[in-house]
Amino acid sequence: MFKSPFFPVPYEHLPNKPKVRMVEPGKVDVPGFDVTALNLHHPGGSLAYRIKGANGDFVYATDHEFGDPSFDEPLAEFARGASVIVLDAHFTPEELPQHKGWGHSDWRQCAEFAASNDIASLWLFHHKPGRSDQALAGIREQAQKTHRATDTASEETTIDI
């Protein structure tokens, strides 16, 4: 995992050695937290996480390509009713057709998913590199027409649950 092409710095050169463990779908043992993982649709695999908080549940679902019911339906069940969801909105609807199979979604799919699954707050992230703040503001505005409580995640965004 800590080697090319997945990571730019070899493990032996890291100043601090992080503990790494494989996580499987299902209950995840994180002391002090109630965490569940679910497989997502992405080449090479990816997991979504649902973390139960005192004031609601947080779902983090990066690297997911909508369009395969065998992944989309379990994700809907997994995320339904969450207070907050963070979803991969890498592409615009216009860009997505040229990138089928890449394992990413567009902002419209994310807004429709959040609206149809009773999710209180949607945060779009995994923005395409080079997309300007102005373009992201336009995406946010468009997505809010489908799911009012939508925002675009940015560096240092914090969410309390």
What are these regions (language model features)?
Residues 67-155:
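Cap/insert and terminal regions of metallo-dependent hydrolase folds
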Residues 59-60, 124:
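Structural beta-sheet core signal
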Residues 1-59, 65-70, 75-76, 133-161:
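Binuclear metal-dependent hydrolase catalytic cores
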